[in-house]
Each structure stands twice: as structure tokens, then as C-alpha cells.
């Protein structure tokens, strides 16, 4: 991260909160009794600046790597291009939780002349484009202005320590004085993040796009193109919510029974595109390019479906085994499923391009 926000120290934070009270005609907080004398004194003498929560989840050594391999070749009648790529990225925020993205791609394109006249005009051509993508992602919550982990860290109290003296995270029992005497929503945001979906989630997506086409040119510059498009995609998402106790005043800050969620969806579809184009000129100055076409696509309920399942009380209590088969309460599991939408569409389109002596253009 090139530029990090400058955060308040614990001492500055306490001064600001006291000033808010003073402006309302109230006395300042009794910080010493809230946090304990030793911690209070370390803030006051500057030996301890408090917790920089944004820095706590910053991944200073985030790695990005990308590799690709491409091969091209052919002849005067056939050409091909093939390539594969791999990309990996560490999340710049996360640090204490796994946050990364990886993607593998493969593509192949080729075109072949089936019939060529003696004068060199390609009458019949066929070709295809195939693209496959595999993505895997796990990370922190990033959506919404307030419902994301960076926002939580920016708004968190720097006077609350992240760790106890023994190295364990501060939890509800350690923050009782904060909850009772300062703010009932006082929480260690890193400990909360560790026990939410931000720390325990994984998604895998696979997509295949394939196109095959036929081009016929019966006379020069009059080209018919028929194209068949196919798409197939699958996605899975798993999340595990462990037992934790960050603050008992908010239902989102503690959990007495772990929970796992499994989502999956699969779908496929197809479409056809047919176009007829013609290029011609008048008196070598008036140049025309005319195209007309149609496209049809459809999706049916039997082309795929989505499934969502949630259950509680895991046998192993970890993300590795966050599957429905490892949950003890499967008899009470919530399971929902929906088919793909039933849709069909037919479209007609056309285009005319004109230029005068390659100086003026109109479309």
C-alpha cells in the first residue's frame, strides 16, 4: 500500500472522546479505571501509542506473480494460437487471515481455409475460439461503505489492546470494563474478523466459453458468418463460523455454536449469431460497409441450478472440514435450491458504415 492513513494514537483518541463529553457539558471518562493503571500510564507517557488496527491487518509483504506461455503458428491456409497463464496475488489487507486470489487460464484459437479460388479469394473458412478459466479466492469482507473490514479497522478504538499479556487476543471477558463504563460495543476488531467469514471462506469458479464459426464468401466482399456460442460455468463457496466471544452485547460479536455454509451452482447456455456483410464502393470514392444479422439465445430450468445448505455443530470445528457431511445437526440443516431462469431472446440488428474518399465517415 503506497500511502496508509494516519491514525489517532490511544492518547489522542482519549482526548478527542473527552472533548466530545466536555462539549456536551459532561465530565471526561475515567480512563484509568476502564483500562487499568499500567496501560493508562503507558499511553500517557507515550511509551505505548495504542493499537493501529489498519496496520494490524496490513500485509506488508504481499506477493504478486504472473506467468504466461503462448504458442502461435500455421501456414497460408491454417493459423493457430494457444496460450496458458497463471496469476497469484496476496491480499494487501488480511495479514492475520488468509487473503489471496489465484487464476489459471487456457485458450486456443484457430482458423482454416477450406476452399480458396485460383485467384486467392477465400470462399469457405472455419474456426474456433475456446477459453477456460479457473479462479480460486479467499479473503476479507470488502463490500459496502461500512460492511467491510477496512472500515471496521478505521473506526476501531486504538486504546483497546489487541493482545493480552500472555499473547492471547483480548475477548469479551477482557473488555468488560470497556463495555460497562465506556461503550457497550467495545470490541477487538481483529479477533472478531478472525472468527467471521473473513477468516474462514473459500470460493472456486470455473468457466468455459467456446465459439465455432463458418464463413462463406460466394462473391468478393459478400460474407456470410454463422457462429455457435457455448457457455458452461460452475461455482462453489464455503464458509465456516467458529465459536467465539468478542462482546456479549451484540449478537454479531459472539457465537455459542459453530456453523458452516456450502453454496454451489452450475449452468450452461448457448446462442447462435448469423450475419451477412457486404463491402462495395461507387466511383472509387463512396465506400460502403453494410451488415445485417440475427442472434438467438436461450436458458432453461434444466440447464442448471443453484444449491445452498447451512448447518451447525461441526464434528471437527475448522474450515478444512466445513462440509455438510461433517455437521452433527444435519437433520436440522437449512437447504434451498433454485433452477436456472427460463428465458429466450431473439434479436435483429444492422449497421451501415460510409466514408467519402477515406476523409469523411458516417455510421
Q: Model regions: which residues?
A:
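Surface-exposed loop/interface segments of Gram-negative outer-membrane beta-barrel transport/assembly proteins
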Residues: 1-50, 92-101, 105, 109-207, ...
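Short Gly/Pro-enriched turn/cap motifs at secondary-structure boundaries
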Residues: 57-61, 340-341
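Outer-membrane beta-barrel channels and translocator barrels
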Residues: 64, 75-76, 115-121, 217-219, ...
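Residues on the lipid-exposed face of transmembrane beta-strands in outer-membrane beta-barrel proteins
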Residues: 69-75, 108-112, 210-216, 274-278, ...
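Beta-strand-loop-alpha "switch" segments that mediate conformational coupling across diverse proteins
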Residues: 85
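Ligand-site clamp/hinge motif
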Residues: 89
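Active-site-proximal binding-pocket segments
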Residues: 362
